[in-house]
């Protein structure tokens, strides 16, 4: 199955390559499942209670993953921001464990979209999920990002992966 890697940012906490305290995650479009995916393992540096990933980190990963689902059509001009997000924590998410986050589009209205995301354990158990309302980023906001961020986005735009 071929997956298309999504672009990354320089500064973003979730995907930013130059963010020294960032998560440095990468997302891939899974066209067969109509979802975006990332796999990762979080160390105890990201815990709340011993052995449990902090809920704010989980919310961050859900926010980024569900938000990236709108880019499944490869139209990276459609980048959106979250207006509203509801997170449900179903089980503790353990540190030092391989995890998978997936995001899907529920409804796409052009400049607004409703998306969902979830974090899964290796056995498929969902530890947390979200539903979110997204809004298209105005061009005036993107214009303030500067050339370095724009160049990074262009440089990391999709390459087919096996």
Q: Language-model features: where?
A:
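Non-catalytic linker/capping segments at the edges of enzyme domains
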Residues: 1-45, 150, 155-162
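HotDog/MaoC-like acyl-thioester-processing domains
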Residues: 1-4, 94-95, 106-162
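A generic structural signal for short beta-strands and their flanking turns/coil linkers
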Residues: 8-9, 21-23, 34-38, 79-85, ...
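Short beta-strand micro-motifs enriched in acidic
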Residues: 28-30, 104-108
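A conserved, well-ordered hydrophobic junction motif at loop->secondary-structure transitions
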Residues: 37-61
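A structural signal for short, well-ordered beta-strand segments
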Residues: 38, 85-89, 103, 117, ...
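Glycine-centered flexibility sites
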Residues: 48-51, 55-56, 67, 96, ...
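Hydrophobic beta-strand-centered segment that forms part of the acyl-chain substrate-binding groove
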Residues: 65-100, 131
